[in-house]
Design a protein with these regions (language model features):
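ABC ATPase NBD Q-loop/coupling interface
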Residues: 16, 65-82
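Helix-to-loop junction immediately C-terminal to a conserved catalytic motif
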Residues: 56
């Protein structure tokens, strides 16, 4: 059986062919099986965020492959699009992920792009908001009026609302207090089950 995610000889170079060329990831290979937790640790600027942006097709490798259930996610446009729904990514900085006028619309963005009915979108928004600890009273507020920790929770809810098979978190507890950290980490464990 193929690994859920397999990275084969992945390299990514920024600004290739310019004086600013930088190899962010070089010849990396690993696999992640269904149900497995994987942590990636490294110092600032070591390529962690670049690496994880490849796992759902936000970045295209300079060389190498990303396989999802044995299929190269860059095989064709349809496969790339589907991989973005199957592999959810919560950014390190929620401000990079939030852009809608209301919290509700931000959480609903992914399910709406999946072509789901309004009823299913609402169900998913409410379920994901509850999962991430986003109070219903915040759903009609602007995400830009929220605290850092609340923005983080909205960003997580927006990904969870798509019900991806794989969820990748880039520093999921940044901006949360100790109780918030414990809550989110517990919810991540629950989602994995």
């Amino acid at each position: 059986m193929a690994a859920t995610i397999e990275v084969r000889d992945l390299s990514h170079t920024y600004s290739a062919g310019t004086p600013f060329q930088h190899d962010a990831v070089k010849h990396m290979s690993f696999s992640v099986e269904k149900g497995e937790f994987l942590g990636i640790i490294g110092h600032t600027g070591s390529g962690k965020s670049t690496l994880i942006q490849h796992l759902n097709g936000l970045l295209r490798p300079t060389s190498g492959e990303i396989l999802l259930d044995g299929t190269n996610i860059w095989q064709d446009k349809k496969t790339t699009r589907e991989s973005r729904f199957r592999v959810g990514l919560v950014f390190q900085y929620p401000e990079y992920q939030l852009f809608e006028e209301t919290v509700y619309r931000d959480i609903a963005f992914g399910p709406k792009n999946m072509g789901l009915s309004e009823e299913e979108i609402r169900t998913r928004v409410l379920r994901a908001a509850g999962f991430a600890g986003v109070d219903e009273s915040l759903l009609e507020k602007s995400p830009f009026d929220l605290s850092g920790g609340q923005k983080r929770r909205v960003a997580i809810a927006g990904v969870i609302a798509m019900e991806p098979e794989v969820v990748i978190f880039d520093e999921p507890t940044a901006g949360l207090d100790p109780a918030g950290c414990a809550s989110i980490l517990g919810n991540i464990r629950d989602y994995q089950k």
